[in-house]
Regions:
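Positively charged n-region of N-terminal signal peptides that target proteins for export
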Residues: 1-4
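N-terminal signal peptide c-region/cleavage motif recognized by signal peptidases
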Residues: 14-16
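Structured catalytic-domain cores with a bias toward divalent-metal coordination
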Residues: 19-349
Length: 349
């Protein structure tokens, strides 16, 4: 009888601990990881009106329960620094030291990466960060967006979407903080952005509020009540190792902030908040000659660059429509109507 009582007592004591682990196994796509293990697999995008394909995914399922953080990159397959950062994180995070789980998606836009085509998925010519939450009856980008919504967004508690300057963008590093109007959620995501460590932060208050028309990946998580943000580093093709390191360190700082890894992450001490971004687009084609570099401060009316025809006759002087900071300036001379020549950030006073 005494042994029976002891056994029942042991079971009763163990039950609360067992009940605390809602995810003894985490499955994302074909990757299945048990506690304290790492698994690789793919998120399958089914064929439809065009071909299907596989998106690589890694699940790092920590030895202890905790939040589930998703880190995604490669929506634009030639934003190389962000892709390499997630590749490095695959080996950098040890599940034995992790409380919670990490979903890593290093390359969403496989066709863009393989064919070295910026901005869009060459299969259907759509941006892979503009079609969320996706559509099962749409083209490849729509179906991929739906697959990521179901397999990544719906399974995580928080999400970081990593980007950078594309092949034609000379970009300075910055993050985006989305303001949803939910104070508790916004305070949480703000703290995550500050922990990440990039000192220039764009305030995004105009993103769609409808979760059925969220458009952007990060916003798809945010409109579902999951504190999330976007970070960008890297530029114009060749990879600067410092940009990769900044993104890797940023994710690790957020893991510390969320108590998923041991250590402390000091928040940015003096963040530069950018309240508006003004895009300077080309109203004609030709050759673009920049007169400013990324990170330059310009006043309204200052020369950003000039456009010439193919015989080097100037056809346009490009002037700053607002005072602010050059977040990125076009990195290549090739220019067609509608192309972005610069983005100017208005700094919050």
């Amino acid at each position: 009888m005494k042994q029976l009582i002891l056994a029942l007592t042991a079971i009763a004591c163990a039950a609360p601990a067992m009940a605390q682990d809602a995810h003894p196994t985490l499955v994302v796509g074909t990757a299945t990881a048990s506690r304290g293990h790492k698994a690789t697999g793919v998120i399958k995008v089914p064929a439809g009106v065009d071909a299907g394909y596989d998106i690589p995914v890694v699940v790092v399922h920590g030895a202890k329960p905790g939040p589930i953080l998703a880190v995604v990159s490669g929506a634009h397959g030639t934003e190389y620094a962000s892709i390499l950062a997630v590749e490095r994180l695959i080996d950098a995070v040890d599940p034995a030291r992790l409380s919670g789980s990490l979903i890593l998606v290093p390359l969403v836009n496989v066709a863009s990466f393989e064919r070295i085509i910026p901005h869009v998925n060459p299969t259907d010519n759509k941006s892979m960060n503009s079609r969320y939450p996706g559509d099962a009856s749409g083209t490849q980008t729509d179906r991929a967006s739906l697959a990521i919504t179901r397999e990544v967004v719906e399974k995580c508690d928080h999400l970081i979407d990593l980007h950078g300057g594309d092949l034609d963008e000379n970009l300075r590093p910055y993050s985006y903080w989305t303001v949803t109007g939910n104070k508790a959620q916004d305070d949480f995501s703000r703290a995550m952005v500050l922990a990440f460590g990039l000192d220039h932060i764009i305030i995004s208050a105009d993103r769609p509020k409808d979760p059925k028309a969220s458009r952007y990946l990060e916003n798809t998580a945010s409109t579902r009540g999951k504190p999330s943000f976007t970070a960008e580093a890297g530029r114009s093709g060749p990879v600067n190792p410092a940009d990769v390191t900044a993104l890797v360190n940023g994710v690790q700082h957020v893991l510390m902030h969320l108590k998923m890894l041991a250590g402390t992450a000091a928040p940015v001490a003096r963040p530069v908040w950018i309240e508006k971004v003004v895009t300077v687009a080309a109203d004609q084609g030709g050759m673009f000659w920049p007169a400013v570099d990324r990170d330059a401060h310009v006043v309204k009316g200052a020369r950003i660059g000039v456009v010439t025809d193919y015989l080097h006759h100037q056809t346009q002087e490009v002037l700053a429509p607002e005072s602010g900071l050059i977040l990125f300036v076009r990195a290549v001379p090739s220019l067609k109507k509608g192309d972005t020549m610069a983005n100017i950030g208005t700094i919050k006073k």
